[in-house]
């Protein structure tokens, strides 16, 4: 590119010389060539300066990315803790390995399990990056100083600053809408109507029919708790969960667990992310209906982050750049993950809108409150539903395996 600039300068000098020559010849004719106004000349010069600066910025960015790739390749290895679905996690890791020749090891864990592991490892993590899963546990990790800030180049493609931590501790890659999934055949058999809103879930006729994930292991459940606190206020939310618990059949380890129970009829109503319901419908369970709560709902930002003290720092940084690119996010829908994507050069999954989901039909979720108070709210939840801590919870209902 620098050589091209030199040629452009030479061409400009020759052009100027030819123009002066033509002007000299033209002055003997009927009309002399008019000079351009000073303002127009200044505008042209400014535009050329801007173009040159943009070229230099692009060159610098490309050079920086090339250097990062080489440094990551020199490390040669990356370990990923993934909290998205297994199919997408596996495909994303395989694609990264194919693109960069870096060996990738991965393990699928719920967000709660990841947080527990990195908290215990205290700055000496056995993995390098976290991929997928809602950001409430990520924000807990930020507050505990367990994530490494990184200013990602590809973050410029995020459609809003909402989808990243202000200090670069995590970056969003997708957005999932919280709601209900119901087995319409079972509801018909039982002579029950579909729930339309959060408070409907408290009706006595739904006793033992509802599935939800376990707040001690699943970020999805933590989001449900935060959502109710933000919509109802703290005390009313805890009373809500105390009543809701009477209708809960089981609290699953994974956030997607309840969605997998609805189709076969293991539970009749599931609380979780509606894209997980789409996965089940497209897998053959057309007896499932998706419901967006009438009074409003919230959403997850599925994220990626680097663990503080990781062993393969450059490979970890390259993973974040990769996760914020179409190479990574566009393969989600090919692997049973139908969340809305939050980068501007991604291909949105048509399946999400076909089932009536709207990424903007959500409450103004307070991420800062979630960052500061999630751990407290989870403790308050268990105090409300078990009259004690999570250790007192019935293990046959609150699954951890």
PLM feature segments, named:
Residues 23-36, 43-52:
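Bacterial lipoprotein signal-peptidase II cleavage site
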Residues 136-140, 268-287:
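A ligand-binding cleft/hinge motif common to bilobed small-molecule-binding domains
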Residues 298, 302, 307-365, 396-397:
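Mature extracytoplasmic/periplasmic domains
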Residues 4-28:
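Sec-dependent N-terminal signal peptides of Gram-positive bacterial secreted proteins and lipoproteins
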Residues 79-93, 105-121, 125-266:
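Extracytoplasmic ligand-binding site segments that recognize negatively charged/polar headgroups
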Residues 359-401:
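Conserved C-terminal helix/tail region of periplasmic/extracytoplasmic solute-binding proteins
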Residues 47, 64-73, 77-79, 83-103, ...:
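Short, polar/charged alpha-helical segment
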Residues 176, 240-245, 251-252, 284-308:
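Periplasmic-binding protein-like
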């Amino acid at each position: 590119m620098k050589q091209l600039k030199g040629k452009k300068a030479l061409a400009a000098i020759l052009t100027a010389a030819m123009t002066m020559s033509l002007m000299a010849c033209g002055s003997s004719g009927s009309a002399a060539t008019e000079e351009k106004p000073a303002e127009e000349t200044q505008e042209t010069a400014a535009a050329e300066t801007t173009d040159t600066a943009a070229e230099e910025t692009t060159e610098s960015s490309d050079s920086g990315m090339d250097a990062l790739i080489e440094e990551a390749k020199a490390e040669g290895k990356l370990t990923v803790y993934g909290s998205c679905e297994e199919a997408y996690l596996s495909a994303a890791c395989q694609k990264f390995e194919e693109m960069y020749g870096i060996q990738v090891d991965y393990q699928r864990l719920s967000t709660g399990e990841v947080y527990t592991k990195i908290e215990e490892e205290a700055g000496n993590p056995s993995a390098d990056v976290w991929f997928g899963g809602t950001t409430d546990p990520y924000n807990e990790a930020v507050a505990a100083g367990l994530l490494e800030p990184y200013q990602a180049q590809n973050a410029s493609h995020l459609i809003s600053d909402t989808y990243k931590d202000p200090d670069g501790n995590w970056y969003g890659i997708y957005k999932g809408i919280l709601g209900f999934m119901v087995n319409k055949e079972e509801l018909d058999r039982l002579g029950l109507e579909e729930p339309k809103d959060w408070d409907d879930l408290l009706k006595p006729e739904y006793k033992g029919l509802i599935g939800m994930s376990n707040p001690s292991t699943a970020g999805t459940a933590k989001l449900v708790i935060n959502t109710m606190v933000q919509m109802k206020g703290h005390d009313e939310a805890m009373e809500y969960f105390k009543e809701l618990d009477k209708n809960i059949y089981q609290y699953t380890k994974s956030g997607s667990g309840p969605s997998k129970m609805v189709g076969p009829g293991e539970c009749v109503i599931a609380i979780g992310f509606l894209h997980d319901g789409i996965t089940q419908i497209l897998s053959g369970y057309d007896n499932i209906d998706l419901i967006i709560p009438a009074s409003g709902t919230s959403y997850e930002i599925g994220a990626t982050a680097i663990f503080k003290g990781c062993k393969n720092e450059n490979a970890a940084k390259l993973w974040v750049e990769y996760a914020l690119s179409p190479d990574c996010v566009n393969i989600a829908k090919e692997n049973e993950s139908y969340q809305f994507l939050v980068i501007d050069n991604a291909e949105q999954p048509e399946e999400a809108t076909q089932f009536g989901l709207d990424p903007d039909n959500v409450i103004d979720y307070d991420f800062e409150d979630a960052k500061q108070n999630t751990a407290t709210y989870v403790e308050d939840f268990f105090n409300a539903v078990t009259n004690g801590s999570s250790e007192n919870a019935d293990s046959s209902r609150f699954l951890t395996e």
